[in-house]
A protein has these predicted regions:
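N-terminal secretory signal peptides that target proteins for export/translocation
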Residues: 1-13
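Aromatic (phenylalanine/tyrosine) cluster motif
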Residues: 5-7, 18, 34
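N-terminal twin-arginine translocation
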Residues: 11-12, 31-33
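Solvent-exposed aromatic/hydrophobic patches embedded in short alpha-helical segments
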Residues: 16-18, 155
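Bacterial N-terminal signal peptides
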Residues: 19-29
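N-terminus-centered regions that define maturation/targeting leaders and the start
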Residues: 33-196
Length: 196
């Protein structure tokens, strides 16, 4: 079947130029979509891949630390973020791992938490809620692994597509994790270690 381009060689060239421009436009759009910086989290108390700060260690079960939740700062969350959540999980604990902290309903305007935000009441002032961790206490519970190899603690800040999750203070951290997973737009992680 013939097309209009069969009758005018110039049309073929023009069609090729238009096709190339359309493709260039798509490539430019894709590149612009990825031109922004990545969603990241950092702490003044430790660095990714390093050891957790001494002030974050639990104060029980053979550990003698101040048990202060870490300072955290996050940047470049998705533009449509409506709230944030944070978890700290020991991936090397036996069986299913160990939840040290889960926080939800942090307002989207917040970009950092000070050290000890859990015990100091700073999170409550923001309207955030904290889960019951695997030490069976509400709020933050720092690292305190059994003696032996160091454990890895994954700290994750989640950007969520809802203002609040249907959770209540003191519900299990695993339940927080399920609700967070269902509303996540993006996440940023750092991993730190601690051993005795």
């Amino acid at each position: 079947m013939r097309t209009p381009y069969d009758f005018d060689p110039g049309c073929t060239r023009r069609a090729s130029v238009f096709t190339w421009l359309a493709m260039a436009s798509v490539v430019t759009t894709v590149n612009l979509a990825y031109a922004g910086e990545n969603f990241t989290v950092s702490s003044a108390d430790f660095s990714d891949g390093g050891k957790i700060g001494s002030r974050q260690i639990f104060n029980d079960a053979g550990c003698k630390g101040p048990n202060q939740s870490p300072s955290l700062t996050w940047r470049n969350a998705p533009a449509t973020t409506r709230s944030f959540a944070i978890t700290i999980f020991d991936r090397d604990a036996p069986a299913r791992g160990w939840w040290h902290w889960a926080v939800a309903n942090i307002p989207a305007s917040v970009k950092s938490l000070p050290e000890n935000a859990s015990a100091s009441g700073a999170l409550r002032k923001l309207g955030a809620i904290e889960a019951r961790n695997d030490f069976n206490i509400d709020g933050y519970g720092g690292p305190c692994p059994p003696p032996g190899n160091p454990h890895r603690y994954v700290i994750t800040v989640y950007a969520l597509n809802v203002d609040t999750l249907p959770l209540a203070q003191g519900r299990p951290a695993a339940l927080f994790d399920r609700e967070i997973s269902g509303s996540t737009l993006g996440s940023a992680q750092i991993t730190v270690t601690y051993g005795r």
